[in-house]
């Protein structure tokens, strides 16, 4: 795996940062972006690249992709992480908050797909993993914007995977449950059959596998990493 290039968005902290650290530890050259500025420091600390750019800003995404290509000449993989959209009473969420969620969760992936797919095609392949949520397919009123738009992300990932499979390009989603990147709540923990929050490194290692050659026959999938919290089979 050493020497391959991965771009991880919205990775200044939390799950995205954990994924970036794991990939660097496995020998990837890592480019990190975040809107907060933390991504610049993290990227440098991992011996890679760091950019300050929001994944909701098309020009910022273009700058991140161009900067990575300028430095390393290729991009082999992308991890699309994102922040947490507005929560609230279902019908009280404003149009503006729905539109912000759309930009953050779905359009950010679509825009980055447009930028990196031609790169993947020139290189003979590539892979993308999108960080979604366990509630994408079992909606939870606690996360209405996230549920609705990440369900759409599941459909998009399947459409993209089918369209570009012949070009040796893969896309998958990971659907995390409750992880220790956020403060633990007893009520949430009690919902989990394994009886605990997930550890960020557990998610990160799964993402690393999906990006690897060992997962070369996996595409268009929505993989639950949730300690068993979802009930459907």
Which residues fall in each region the model found?
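A conserved structural motif in NAD(P)-dependent oxidoreductases
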Residues: 192-203, 214
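Catalytic loop of short-chain dehydrogenase/reductase
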Residues: 129-152, 157-166
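Substrate-binding pocket helix/loop in short-chain dehydrogenase/reductase
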Residues: 89-90, 94-102, 188
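Conserved NAD(P)H cofactor-binding loop of Rossmann-fold oxidoreductase domains
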Residues: 81-86, 227-228
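Alpha-helical segment proximal to the catalytic Tyr-Lys
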Residues: 118, 162-166, 216
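Conserved glycine-rich cofactor-binding loop
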Residues: 12-14
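Short C-terminal tail/terminal secondary-structure segment
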Residues: 138, 219-233
């Amino acid at each position: 795996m050493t020497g391959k290039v991965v771009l991880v968005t919205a990775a200044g902290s939390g799950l995205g940062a954990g994924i970036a650290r794991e990939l660097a530890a496995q020998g990837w050259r890592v480019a990190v972006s975040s809107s907060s500025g933390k991504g610049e420091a993290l990227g440098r600390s991992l011996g890679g690249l760091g950019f300050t750019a929001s994944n909701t800003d098309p020009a910022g995404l273009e700058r991140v992709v161009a900067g990575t290509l300028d430095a390393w000449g290729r991009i082999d993989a992308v991890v699309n992480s994102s922040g947490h959209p507005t929560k609230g009473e279902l019908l009280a969420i404003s149009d503006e908050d729905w539109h912000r969620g759309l930009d953050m969760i779905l359009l950010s992936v679509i825009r980055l797909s447009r930028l990196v797919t031609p790169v993947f095609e020139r290189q003979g392949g590539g892979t993308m993993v999108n960080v979604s949520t366990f509630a994408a397919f079992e909606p939870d009123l606690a996360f209405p914007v996230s549920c609705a738009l990440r369900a759409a992300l599941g459909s998009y990932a399947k459409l993209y995977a089918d369209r570009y499979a012949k070009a040796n390009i893969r896309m998958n989603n990971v659907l995390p449950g409750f992880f220790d990147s956020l403060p633990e709540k007893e009520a949430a923990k009690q919902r989990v059959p394994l009886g605990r929050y997930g550890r960020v490194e557990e998610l990160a290692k799964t993402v690393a596998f999906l990006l690897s050659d060992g997962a070369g026959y996996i595409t268009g999938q929505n993989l639950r990493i949730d300690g068993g919290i979802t009930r459907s089979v």
